[in-house]
């Protein structure tokens, strides 16, 4: 689930029900260039995750106030706060399996960057577009987006065609043409809209 306030400028909260982060690894997760996704050099050729360089968490903690709560399976929960890039102490905390990261006051300490933010409305539109892209790319995952207390998206795990209909428009239901092509070592699967769904803007290509 993704919760934002004022287009993410005041609050961004990301919560998942994944494997969680053990308490003794929480500080490592926020150190630059630290990653749990690569164990050997060979892993570089089979990466299928959204990130692996260990930069995202370290970058966000340098420009915001961050709190993380996480619990792995059959383990107690742990919590840690990071302010201005400084890691706090890891503390026991009530938590279910998974991780929740809360980001407050984005760019509060870098006014030069903050001035480039658009209005909360415009930044919110960017958040919605990003969530839509992730939701379409991972239809087997549930996604929920809440903005300023309002439910914007609430998607359950489903097949790709149903996900397209729920994210884009119910009118897409009978207007999609399936693609399923395989050649040698690559394949292409997805859907095209028929002529009734032609748009003048190229933005609806996912």
What residue ranges belong to the model's regions?
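N-terminal phosphate-binding caps/lids of nucleotide- and nucleic-acid-binding domains
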Residues: 1-206
């Amino acid at each position: 689930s993704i919760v934002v306030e004022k287009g993410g400028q005041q609050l961004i909260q990301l919560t998942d029900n994944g494997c969680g982060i053990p308490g003794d690894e929480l500080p490592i997760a926020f150190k630059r260039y630290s990653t749990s996704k690569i164990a050997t050099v060979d892993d570089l050729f089979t990466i299928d995750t959204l990130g692996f360089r260990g930069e995202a968490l370290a970058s966000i903690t340098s420009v915001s106030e961050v709190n993380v709560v996480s619990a792995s399976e059959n383990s107690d929960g742990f919590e840690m706060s990071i302010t201005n890039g400084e890691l706090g102490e890891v503390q026991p905390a009530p938590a279910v399996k998974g991780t929740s990261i809360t980001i407050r006051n984005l760019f509060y300490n870098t006014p030069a960057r903050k001035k480039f933010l658009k209005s909360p409305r415009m930044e919110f539109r960017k958040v919605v577009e990003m969530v839509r892209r992730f939701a379409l790319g991972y239809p087997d995952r549930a996604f929920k987006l809440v903005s300023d207390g309002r439910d914007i998206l609430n998607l359950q795990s489903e097949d790709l065609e149903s996900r397209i209909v729920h994210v884009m428009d119910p009118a897409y239901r009978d207007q999609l043409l399936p693609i399923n092509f395989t050649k040698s070592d690559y394949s292409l699967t997805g859907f095209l809209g028929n002529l009734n769904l032609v748009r003048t803007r190229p933005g609806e290509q996912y």
